[in-house]
Swiss-Prot record:
GO terms for biological process: carbohydrate metabolic process; cell division; cell wall organization; lipid glycosylation; peptidoglycan biosynthetic process; regulation of cell shape. It is found in: Cell membrane. Its main location: membrane. It is a peripheral membrane protein. Pathway: Cell wall biogenesis; peptidoglycan biosynthesis. Its EC number is 2.4.1.227. This is UDP-N-acetylglucosamine--N-acetylmuramyl-(pentapeptide) pyrophosphoryl-undecaprenol N-acetylglucosamine transferase. UDP-N-acetyl-alpha-D-glucosamine binds at residues 15-17, 127, 164, 192, 246, 265-270, 290. It holds the Pfam family Glyco_tran_28_C. NCBIfam families: murG. One of its GO terms (molecular function) is undecaprenyldiphospho-muramoylpentapeptide beta-N-acetylglucosaminyltransferase activity. Keywords: Cell cycle, Cell division, Cell membrane, Cell shape, Cell wall biogenesis/degradation, Glycosyltransferase, Membrane, Peptidoglycan synthesis, Transferase. Belongs to the glycosyltransferase 28 family. MurG subfamily.
């Protein structure tokens, strides 16, 4: 990149998936001397995670447009319009060289303000089905579109989802599984907010399959005490750990033989980059994007899917009773073979190409 300090705005957030992708890119950009300003929500995960990473954040107050409540939709439109005006003024003052939109409804005002201001805009779509914000931006603007998975947008470049460095350092499946014996190690992850269906069903399943598993279970903050008490009532020889939130997920990933989790875009990308057998329980979003994220690994035999309505104690006991480490290793190897490496570098290359074209 050029010797002068390049200013880049990253806009988006709302969920851990969006934020961790953006942070992975931001860290690489800072290393090569770029100045980063983040535009995010005032009351979501980015509002406290971004400052912890020593990145300046400009907070806006927006709400999503989904749902059937007409009044809330109207409020969403008003807040979005107001935020567009605020960000337009910010862009005029800050003078960014380029803006990167990482998705989520909070990204929309920043991306629209960028387009109106005629500043170069790149959109990164993390899911296999585009979110509403990115779909509108794709139709409305002439911005550069990058995608994590093939066929989300026609003719868009596939770059994957950037993965945190600690996760990229995890050993290959062959090295992890070498000499591993004893009960199957199951990691249960419900996302940063937890997942009630996993918290409800899995402790009961463990009770019916004693001695077969060791379980690490991330419950989320709100149901931590409930899940912990469920496991405490199990047989004393059942090994388990319950976490409200696993701070260093790379340790948990390296430990696991099998992961049972939702199928958000970043989770699927992390699982593939490491190579872990997965049992996905997609969240029932309106556009069903988590199901289609999971389908990418399920199609190659690297994962299995149970829809939430079918995720019962009986079905899970039947599935897990015959699951062994050999099956996990084969699935892990298939998953690893699909991984996309150097995603952050690919995105930075596209940023550099676009700035070079317009300067």
């Amino acid at each position: 990149m050029k010797n002068t300090k390049i200013k880049i705005i990253i806009t988006g957030g709302g969920s851990g998936g969006h934020v961790f992708v953006g942070l992975s890119i931001a860290e690489q950009l800072i290393k090569i001397g770029c100045e980063i300003l983040w535009i995010g929500s005032s009351d979501r995960i980015e509002s406290y995670l971004i400052p912890k990473s020593n990145i300046k954040i400009y907070k806006i107050n927006v709400i999503g447009f989904n749902g059937n409540n007409i009044f809330l939709k109207l409020i969403s439109l008003i807040k979005t319009a107001y935020s567009i005006l605020k960000i337009k003024k910010l862009i005029k003052y800050y003078k960014p060289d380029i803006v990167l939109s990482i998705g989520g409804y909070v990204s929309f005002p920043g991306a629209i303000a960028t387009w109106i201001s005629k500043v170069p805009l790149i959109i990164h779509e993390q899911n296999s089905v585009p979110g509403l914000s990115n779909y509108i931006l794709y139709k409305l603007t002439n911005c550069k579109i990058l995608q994590a998975f093939p066929n989300t947008f026609p003719r868009a470049k596939v770059v994957g989802n950037p993965i945190r460095n600690a996760i990229l350092k995890i050993k290959t499946p062959e090295k992890r599984f070498l000499g591993r014996f004893g009960p199957l190690r199951i990691l249960v992850i419900g996302g940063s907010q937890g997942a009630s269906i996993l918290n409800l069903v899995i402790p009961d399943v463990a009770k019916y399959l004693p001695n077969k598993f060791h379980i690490w279970h991330q419950s989320g903050y709100s149901e931590y005490e409930l899940v912990k008490s469920k496991y405490e009532k199990l047989f004393h020889h059942t090994e388990y750990k319950v976490f409200d939130f696993i701070k260093d997920i790379s340790i948990a990933y390296e430990w696991a033989d099998l992961i049972i989790c939702r199928s958000g875009a970043l989770t699927v990308s992390e699982i593939s980059s490491i190579g872990i057998a997965a049992l996905f329980v997609p969240y029932n979003h309106k556009d069903n994007h988590q199901y289609w994220n999971a389908k990418i690994l399920e199609k190659i035999g690297a994962a299995e899917i149970i829809n939430q309505k079918d995720f019962t104690k009986k079905k899970l006991i039947k599935l897990l009773s015959s699951w062994d480490r050999k099956k996990s290793l084969i699935m892990s190897q298939k998953s690893k073979n699909l991984s996309i490496t150097n995603s952050a570098k690919k995105i930075i290359k596209e940023i550099n190409n676009l700035i070079g074209l317009v300067k």
